[in-house]
């Protein structure tokens, strides 16, 4: 892995899988706090590191988490998808191992929060990607209800489509209870660290 004058990484590898290992290592070097937080948020494991103030978000995240069997899931992807994810996460884990051995520095964010980066499994990549598939779920529910109740003109005022597309009103927009919408919103939210949340205790 060579860095150019702009700090951009250029990977040279003897095989495609080695390139993915190098990319995992480089991603960990550049963004370990970010990807570690993505993993913990996606798997519903924030409270393990940050305390009971994150239990509600963990519960909501686990509602959206893919929990199916991995064999059929891998079989639905390209033939080399599992090997690619294995190689990529091996690269991440190699960087984490370097930190654990004292050979690489622990990113400052972990020091400030008193946490440590976790090891990845290949299936983590698949399980947390389900969150990306529902990221706009709340917006889609709002759009469907607005189309049904007030028509496309009202929805265009809320958020115009780019490019403009005529959207017929759905015959039956989901009439979810507010608790379900709140869970969707919380389960797809980013992670914030207000002091009162970090100081929360179990009731």
State each model region's role.
Residues 2-203:
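Substrate-recognition/specificity elements adjacent to catalytic centers across diverse enzyme folds
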């Amino acid at each position: 892995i060579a860095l150019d004058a702009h700090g951009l990484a250029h990977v040279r590898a003897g095989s495609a899988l080695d390139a993915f290992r190098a990319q995992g290592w480089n991603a960990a070097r550049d963004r370990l706090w970010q990807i570690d937080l993505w993993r913990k948020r996606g798997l519903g494991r924030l409270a393990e590191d940050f305390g009971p103030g994150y239990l509600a978000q963990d519960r909501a995240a686990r509602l959206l988490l893919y929990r199916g069997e991995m064999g059929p899931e891998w079989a639905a992807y390209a033939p080399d998808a599992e090997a690619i994810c294995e190689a990529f996460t091996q690269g991440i884990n190699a960087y984490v191992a370097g930190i654990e051995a004292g050979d690489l520095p622990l990113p400052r964010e972990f020091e400030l929060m008193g946490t440590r980066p976790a090891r990845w499994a290949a299936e983590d990549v698949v399980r947390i990607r389900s969150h990306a598939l529902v990221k706009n779920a709340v917006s889609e529910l709002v759009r469907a209800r607005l189309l049904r109740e007030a028509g496309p003109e009202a929805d265009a005022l809320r958020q115009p489509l780019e490019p403009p597309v005529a959207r017929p009103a759905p015959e039956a927009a989901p009439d979810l209870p507010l608790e379900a919408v709140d869970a969707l919103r919380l389960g797809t939210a980013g992670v914030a660290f207000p002091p009162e949340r970090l100081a929360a205790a179990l009731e």
